[in-house]
Amino acid sequence: NGKPSETPTHHPHLNTSSFEEELILYTTTMFTSRRSFFAMCGAIVFPGVSLGEIIRTPWQGEGPFYPDRIPEDTDNDLVKNGHSTIEAGGKILNLMGSLINSDSKPIKGMTVEIWQTDMNGVYRHMGSFGSKMRDDQFQGFGRSITDKNGHFSFRTIIPVEYPGRTPHIHLKLLNESENVLTTQLYIQGHPLNKKDFLFKQMTKAEQNINSMKLIKNNSTEYETSTILVV
């Protein structure tokens, strides 16, 4: 705990030069069927557009609630804070992703950061609304380092709404200290998306790219996948 987390080593190490082939093989190890994988791609690739034509992930604002104090525990499991054995409240979400460049080549060794509110809509930030309701078991911030195939993962909770915003997860991509990308991930089809001022600033294509399709993988946990293109 406390260190950025490498993606778990059970992901396949593929030598194929075809991004489409690698993505299918990788993602089908995370989901129960190829049908689940292609359903997931609906949140990433536009209908009728090949993987080779996907566009860059859109930039979105960092917002005011990037942690004012980075917690001691910054690993990729946000559901457990530090050495606590008690899990945070909320519905668990396994977020898995791939980082590629505009030529569809995987990018390794990059730091992916995420931060979000707890189940009560409270950030780990002194200025957050409702700080007295903060779930101290929720880490609220985490890091994962992309492996040689560009893969990263987080264990967190499904984001919730709070006044003025639809549910979302903040994401930042760093190459050492250089900020390569800042964006936000949304829940596909959430009714508040159409009212959210930041979501509405994106084109339909960008909304698709930044929307997470949630799949229930057992009685208590969900999973989703995303592709970051820089």
Outline where the language-model segments fall:
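Short, 15-30-residue, compositionally biased linear elements
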Residues: 46-50
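Beta-strand-dominated extracellular/periplasmic modules and repeats
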Residues: 51-213, 217-230
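Residue-level detector of alpha-helical hydrophobic segments embedded in or interacting with membranes
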Residues: 3-7, 42, 59
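N-terminal secretory signal peptides and thylakoid transit peptides that target proteins
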Residues: 23-45
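N-terminal amphipathic/basic-hydrophobic helices that include classical n-h-c signal peptides
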Residues: 1-28
